[in-house]
């Protein structure tokens, strides 16, 4: 399957284990299926596809703390154990792995799989890996969804300087998307939720302003009402047909998410972002989703991994 993609690795069924103390099909490990041939995805039976992007090369290039390459498998391991409260069909399609600093190749191959799955009517729920997953994920969606907006829950804009032909990193994905949109003469629709004042330099705030980025700071989520926040999201998504939703776990406070490259002492709580995430899913406009920056070697008692899995489970159960 995907034999022409050198960095693709098939799913590992051993990751999907859990308690068997209740009726069949009540936990994710009992719901997951695997396929042997990509032609099995060319059917009318639409599925949610789990796809990992096992890379921390972008984090390394960004001078961060590595370990996120192990994130996808750990998220799958934790998700497997959780109860599943819906009747959706899930497929673990495996991972795209970044080897030997070949980030650009890995991103291209990840994008090809995303494109193939969406072209055949499936939805992607992807697990990073560093936030370099965002540029890979977007490339797989852009030609299929012309009026596509990006909503990023993140402490950082990830708009660090990037010029075409340079190597990107975990801090440049949305600069890369902006450059791509400019080249294609497409509007750049980008919204960032949970921005930390001291996680971004003044020049990054200036760049966000120049690119007309919509954003809410972490303070906005503490100080403003949920109704105000939802009105902000409504204004952003009003003229968009589709949304690519990406979650960087460092948007959350270090006490909840210690296992990330750049933990945030003044980050948000899970229940400050969950209502907004669920609202976006309920809008019907989210076509693809990922969660990034889990670094198992930096985690404490699986706190971040378990939280990542719970966030995914909550969103998969939201209609």
From Swiss-Prot:
The keyword Metal-binding applies. Catalyzes the conversion of N-formimidoyl-L-glutamate to L-glutamate and formamide. Belongs to the arginase family. Its EC number is 3.5.3.8. Keywords: Histidine metabolism, Hydrolase, Manganese, Metal-binding. InterPro entries: HutG, Ureohydrolase, Ureohydrolase_dom_sf. SUPFAM superfamilies: Arginase/deacetylase. Its cofactor is Mn(2+). It catalyses: N-formimidoyl-L-glutamate + H2O = formamide + L-glutamate. Pfam families: Arginase. Binds 2 manganese ions per subunit. Pathway: Amino-acid degradation; L-histidine degradation into L-glutamate; L-glutamate from N-formimidoyl-L-glutamate (hydrolase route): step 1/1. It comes from Legionella pneumophila subsp. pneumophila (strain Philadelphia 1 / ATCC 33152 / DSM 7513). Mn(2+) 2 binds at residues 154, 156, 248, 250. Mn(2+) 1 binds at residues 131, 154, 158, 248. CDD domains: Formimidoylglutamase. One of its GO terms (molecular function) is formimidoylglutamase activity. One of its GO terms (biological process) is putrescine biosynthetic process from arginine, via agmatine. This is Formimidoylglutamase.
